[in-house]
């Protein structure tokens, strides 16, 4: 990770050499003031983000570990489908037998016609 070269104080105390046709001292000072404000804002942001990371890591260590195994309260969908289809098959067999009992005489009577 790259380290920070300048602090806000370093920028504030930076002295520039003067030349005959140099930059406007007022403009340079205003620009450096803005840079200092940015550095202070970034430093505060980095500090708050580091604190948030530390808080989240601490919260993560306090939480119990969640296992990847399926919980017993949720049945396997394949097992549910298999038992459901067997149940449906049993119901259809029973319904067929009951229909033969109830309507069997009517079916036999209609075949005589």
Swiss-Prot record:
NCBIfam families, sorted: DivI1A_domain, PRK14127.1
PANTHER family named among the record's database cross-references:
CELL CYCLE PROTEIN GPSB, CELL DIVISION PROTEIN DIVIVA
Keyword Signal appears in the UniProt entry: no
Taxonomy-wise, where does this protein's organism fall, top ranks first? Bacteria, Bacillati, Bacillota, Bacilli, Lactobacillales
Name the InterPro entries on file.
Answer: Cell_cycle_GpsB, DivIVA_domain, DivIVA_fam
Any one annotated GO CC term = cytoplasm
Where, subcellularly, is it found? Cytoplasm
Q: Which gene encodes it?
A: gpsB
Ranges that cross the membrane: none
What job does the chain carry out?
A: Divisome component that associates with the complex late in its assembly, after the Z-ring is formed, and is dependent on DivIC and PBP2B for its recruitment to the divisome. Together with EzrA, is a key component of the system that regulates PBP1 localization during cell cycle progression. Its main role could be the removal of PBP1 from the cell pole after pole maturation is completed. Also contributes to the recruitment of PBP1 to the division complex. Not essential for septum formation.
Q: What does the record list as coiled-coil region(s)?
A: 36-63
Binding partners and assembly: Forms polymers through the coiled coil domains. Interacts with PBP1, MreC and EzrA.
Family, as annotated: Belongs to the GpsB family.
Q: Does the keyword Cell division apply?
A: yes
Q: Which species does the entry assign this protein to?
A: Streptococcus pneumoniae (strain Taiwan19F-14)
Which Pfam families does this chain map to?
Answer: DivIVA
- Write out the entry's keywords from A to Z: Cell cycle, Cell division, Cell shape, Coiled coil, Cytoplasm
* Stretches for region Disordered: 61-82
Record-given protein name: Cell cycle protein GpsB
GO biological processes: cell division; regulation of cell shape
